[in-house]
Amino acid sequence: MRSAAYALSLLAAVAVLTFGRPALASHYAVADVPRLITPADAEKLKKAGVATTEDLLTKAAKTKDRKALAKSSGIGAGTLLDLARRCDLLRIKGIGSEMVLLLEAAGVKSVAELAKKDVAGLSPAVTRANQTKKITEKPPADEQIHFWIEEAKKLPVVLETK
């Protein structure tokens, strides 16, 4: 008899296949995610040499680098931290801009925070957040949330939040 963890992993894999190609931060130009980065901020970032969400995460991961980017872009360091947190979540396979907003609304702001969650606690929070904010037509199933949590546990912490 196979374990429950194996069954959940298998269901998560099926869910990923169902939801299509995984979304990764390197796949987005800053101008292509207007729900995450305003067009005005995207323009400022491009002028400061930040072309992709991956670039943004790299250049805003450390506090000192965020301060430098704030100076060169004209975007506040606090806003850059918020944007970097969003880009951090984009590193998880299957998470795109809509799911970043849903996770944020459920109280998850980074990969490190997601890695500490469990499905039993996060799934109801995601459901409540979506009922309140109406972010997506198709909220993630428990299997998808489990997959994201497991993926988050595998990724290194890159975002300095202090």
Enumerate the predicted regions with their spans.
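Conserved binding/catalytic microenvironments
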Residues: 1
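C-terminal extensions
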Residues: 4-5, 10-162
